[in-house]
Every structure is written in structure tokens, then in C-alpha cells.
Amino acid sequence: MIIIVTGMPGSGKSKIVKEFEKRGVPSVSMGDVVREETAKRGLELTKENVAKVSIRLRQELGQNAVAKLAVEKVRELLRKNKVVVIDGVRSLDEVGTFRSAFPGEEIIIVAVHTPPHMRFERLKARGRHDDPQSWEDFEERDWKELKFGIGNVIAMADYMIVNDCPKEEYERRVQELVEKILAEH
């Protein structure tokens, strides 16, 4: 089984991924795939370089480029595990790539929704090199994500979790969701 975790930047996807990992489920991060490709091309890991490589990959390999690069990592993990989590799928093209590459696998989409103002504050506090520091940067990044088609992936989710509460409550919701998914599938 493949579990795709999607949501806007800063929504709380990594909390879900970590909860699956606590239960022994390995993961592949789509963002890490792009960062690895950026490093392979000899570029410094800046927001600009990662964005350029992301665009270049899609020009070279198509809109599902990152998924194509992630397929072998997922395949390798599925050889040793019944369940694999993919973090950060952004388009239905990418979902389709995984469905085509793994026709016998059940694929489940889990989406996280978090209000924009909460995501902005989290991203500012997180401090990753590519996180926005102004509301304008934040909105620009959101529009880029939406242009990739992330809203379509969220709309097709099998499970939706809302992260609009204190951290402890969200952690409880995540634990319940992960337990439910693993029990039902």
C-alpha cells in the first residue's frame, strides 16, 4: 500500500509522516528528491536554485518529473515493506505516475488542511532555507503550489485532516487517523 500525504506548505504533513514512521512505515519525500537533484547538479541549496531545478526537471521530464525520479525509491522500499508513505505529492500527474508504476498497490491520499494564517506563522518559525518570511512571499508560494495542481490532489483525498487547533489536539487527531488507516487497509 502507498499512502500519499499532501497539503499546502506548512500544513502539518510532516507530523503525519512522522507518525507513520513511528509505526515502522518508511517514507519518500518529494521535496528531498528535488533537493537531491539540485545538489547532484552542483548547485547550492537555496530557495532559488531548488525552484529552478524543480522547473527544469518538469521541462526535461514532464509535469510528473519528481514522481518519476521518486518511483525507484518507492519500489525499493516496497520490496521490504507492505506500506510506504510519499510526502509532498503536488499534482494529479504525479498521483497518476505512482498509480501506473504500481498497478497492484492500493494507493491512498491523505490531505491536510490548515488555515493560511496558521501556515504562514509556522513557516516563518520553521526557518528552512526556502520558507517565506513575508506575507507576500507566502502568497506567491501558495499560488505556485496551486498552479502545480495541489488543490486537485487535495480534492481527491481519501482522508482529510484539519489542522486548526493546538499542537496537542492535532497530534491526537493524527494518531487517530494513522491508526484508522493502518487498521482499515
UniProtKB/Swiss-Prot annotation:
At the top level, the lineage of the source is Archaea
Q: Does the keyword Cell cycle apply?
A: no
Organism of origin is Thermococcus onnurineus (strain NA1)
Instruction: Identify the Pfam families for this entry.
Output: AAA_17
What is the protein's name according to its record?
A: UPF0200 protein TON_1344
Q: State the family it belongs to.
A: Belongs to the UPF0200 family.
Keywords in alphabetical order? ATP-binding, Nucleotide-binding
For this chain, one GO molecular function annotation is: ATP binding
Q: Which positions does UniProt annotate for ATP binding?
A: G7, M8, P9, G10, S11, G12, K13, S14
